[in-house]
Amino acid sequence: MADTQPCDPFAEYGLADPFIPSDFFWQPGMLVAGVDEVGRGPLVGAVVTAAVILDPKYPIVGLADSKKISEKKRLALESEIKSHALGWALGRAESDEIDQLNILHATMLAMQRAVAALPVEAHAVLIDGNRVPALQCPAQAVVKGDGRVPAISAASILAKVARDREMYALHARYPQYGFDRHKGYPTAVHMAALEQHGALAEHRRSFGPVAAAIAQGNLF
C-alpha cells in the first residue's frame, strides 16, 4: 500500500458530528473513498454519483453537505477537490435505467460506476446513507455521512455541481420547464410545466407525476 495516511476528520476538518471509523478504516496506508449521490428525488434526468479519495497532505477547508452551502461555494470547492484529491470520479444512471431498475437499484449502480472509474484503487469505501452497493472492496454506510465524513462531503459537492450543470443544459433546450430553478424536483413550477407542456424524453416515466402526464397524453 502507499504511505498516504487517511484524513483525520477531528484534526483537519473540525466537524461538529464526525463519524468515528472502525480500526479497519483507520489503518496506515488505507485509501478510503467517500461516495455520495445527487438526484434521487427529481422527476427528470440521471441520478449522479461521485467517489473521492482525499489527500491528507491537502486538507480542504469548508467541506460540508452540498445542500448546505451556496452554489458559489460549491463551485470553488469543486475546483479545489479536483485539483488536490488523490482521485475522483463521477458515475450515473440514466432516466431509462431508473425506470427499468427503480431509483434505489439505479443509485447503487451509479455508485458502483463511480468507484470503478476512480483513477486510483480505493482500499475501502464510506458511503452516505444506510445502504451499500456490491463493491470489490470493503464498504460501510454512514448515515448523514455528507456532513460527517470529509471525503463524502467532497463527493456530494462534485455530484451536485455535475448534476446541476446538466439541469442548466436541459433548461437551455427547454426553458419553459424551469429546470434552472428546481433542478428537476417536483415543485409547483415543474408540475405545472409538466401538465402544460407534457413529459420529455428525459423524464422518468416510472415516477408518479410523469406517468400521470403520459397517461393523459401529455408528451412534449
Curated annotation (Swiss-Prot):
A GO term for molecular function: manganese ion binding
Cofactor note: Manganese or magnesium. Binds 1 divalent metal ion per monomer in the absence of substrate. May bind a second metal ion after substrate binding.
Signal peptide range: none
Sequence ranges assigned to domain RNase H type-2 in this UniProt record: 30-219
GO biological process, one term: mismatch repair
Cofactor: Mn(2+); Mg(2+)
Gene3D superfamilies for this protein: Ribonuclease H-like superfamily/Ribonuclease H
Record's subcellular location: Cytoplasm
SUPFAM superfamilies tied to this protein: Ribonuclease H-like
Reactions catalysed according to its record: Endonucleolytic cleavage to 5'-phosphomonoester
UniProt: a divalent metal cation binding residues: 36-37, 128
Any one of the GO CC terms: ribonuclease H2 complex
Keywords carried by this UniProt record: Cytoplasm, Endonuclease, Hydrolase, Manganese, Metal-binding, Nuclease
Protein origin, superkingdom: Bacteria
EC assignment: 3.1.26.4
Pfam families: RNase_HII
Protein purpose: Endonuclease that specifically degrades the RNA of RNA-DNA hybrids.
PANTHER family: RIBONUCLEASE H2 SUBUNIT A (PTHR10954), RIBONUCLEASE HII (PTHR10954:SF18)
Family, per entry: Belongs to the RNase HII family.
Protein name as catalogued: Ribonuclease HII
Organism: Alcanivorax borkumensis (strain ATCC 700651 / DSM 11573 / NCIMB 13689 / SK2)
